[in-house]
């Protein structure tokens, strides 16, 4: 059919009118067109494009929702990595962050520093790419280096422009931001799911993440996600600050959080945080803190990055939420190291955006300290809005005839005697054949930071064990699609994918294999340090206590743990089996592992420990600190950076207070370690 100039002009007019209406409605929240008029114009444009498909452009409003579902998502490497942010859980930690960056870069031109404050939106981070002003790619954050391309789904988000609203756009524009579900939309979706008998989403963040990974973009479109842009990357652009970037994004057609603020001093940042700590309850979306960034790009560049975080930004998290609930039962779980951890099973309670039914009680000492009993009303808290814990018992509400809880003396999984090793706060099952230990070891082996075997979660691990298919980590590598296809929830396609993932894990580097073995105290950072100094499993297994403990960041506790692990015959047999099936148990020429001491969390920091800690022994705390690059001494002095304080602290606490030394609780220590 012939395309007349009048038709071309009409299509262009319709497209421009609809784009303006979309921007006014979804970004400015100021509608300029009645719904009926919008629908009429949309139908006219859609009809003209169907009659003349050569007139369709990628930025047309009709092209937001694709017709065909995706078969799968493809992993892609980010052009620019998406870093995590360091967390601060109180204003003192915010001040400490400022002192850290000031110490690391002292130059006159940055004596006056501005900070940009933005609400930290509780959603899913996305990376967007525009070429010559047109949206071409949307990718999930993933692990920060690689993510999944979900371009079709991202196109459905109306607050993301398909074409930048600027003249002469740069050839490449990279935008970062957060996709989220408004609270009213979250409630609507859950109401519909409840009516259909589907499982409810726990919180808006989970709902947003699950929505973005839908294969059918029509489902994504129905859920009405929103997007706040917060980072801009341009090549050779004359933009010198974060504040200018946010304005550029807004002028380009993006929705930028309207509550951002440019602060001249840290006192203003604190006031902003306190304001939104209260006012956030009135927002139409979830926010879990405030992101604070140094405004000046030159200073940002000078400060640079750690392994995981930009030094020029920090996330100041809101205080943990607390709520009362009833303890229905106390159960114990056996972990992969044999540690037996008591858990409180409670009446469901809504806390920090999720429904909580269980909370850790850590160990028998903590239970005795709390005097917690079945039937008690307790206050629970989500530290950092992640880990539920019982903080106190409301004994005035305790019903009569409750009994003190006693920890079991035999393993609930294998009935072996439980032992409390000398100097430890936890009791352990020492039976290496215990099914719970095997289950935990397999799940750890398959985890993202270890061998990263996709599809091998706890449910599949349980099925493999129950069906007698796996009795050790090495057994995974003898599985075939035929042997697992008949397992519950499996099927031939899933079986093929799982076996491919297991086979693919043979290419994971030695450092990941070492971490996956689950040697006590050997985290991913320590595994890298060990591999750098002992490039093969044979060298590591034969290393002396002196050579191990002399490695920076290892220390005596970790060294002894490694020696103990290799002294067990069953573990040595496992290494032989892993060699046989082809795992990487030595470094290759292409594998370069460098872990700078300056990049470890507590590098150069001196700690002193005083009092009795709630869950850790002094040796355990010391090992964790040393593993993170710190040093533990026996006395407080001006050179002490932190005092780790437990109950019944002695004169060291008094001395630290006189010297103005920072004090940490065990919870503070663990939060700092986890945030790294």
From Swiss-Prot:
Function: DNA ligase that catalyzes the formation of phosphodiester linkages between 5'-phosphoryl and 3'-hydroxyl groups in double-stranded DNA using NAD as a coenzyme and as the energy source for the reaction. It is essential for DNA replication and repair of damaged DNA.
Encoding gene (name): ligA
This protein's UniProt keywords: DNA damage, DNA repair, DNA replication, Ligase, Magnesium, Manganese, Metal-binding, NAD, Zinc
Stretches assigned to the BRCT domain: 597-676
Keyword match Lyase: no
Lineage: Bacteria, Bacillati, Cyanobacteriota, Cyanophyceae, Oscillatoriophycideae
PROSITE patterns recorded: BRCT, DNA_LIGASE_N1
InterPro entries: BRCT_dom (IPR001357), BRCT_dom_sf (IPR036420), DisA/LigA_HHH (IPR041663), DNA_ligase (IPR001679), DNA_ligase_AS (IPR018239), DNAligase_adenylation (IPR013839), DNAligase_N (IPR013840), Hlx-hairpin-Hlx_DNA-bd_motif (IPR003583)
Keyword hit for Mitochondrion: no
HAMAP family on file: DNA_ligase_A
Reactions performed catalytically: NAD(+) + (deoxyribonucleotide)n-3'-hydroxyl + 5'-phospho-(deoxyribonucleotide)m = (deoxyribonucleotide)n+m + AMP + beta-nicotinamide D-nucleotide
Name used for this protein in its record: DNA ligase
Top-level taxon of origin: Bacteria
Binding residues for Zn(2+): 411, 414, 429, 434
Cited Pfam families: BRCT (PF00533), DNA_ligase_aden (PF01653), DNA_ligase_OB (PF03120), DNA_ligase_ZBD (PF03119), HHH_2 (PF12826), HHH_5 (PF14520), Nlig-Ia (PF22745)
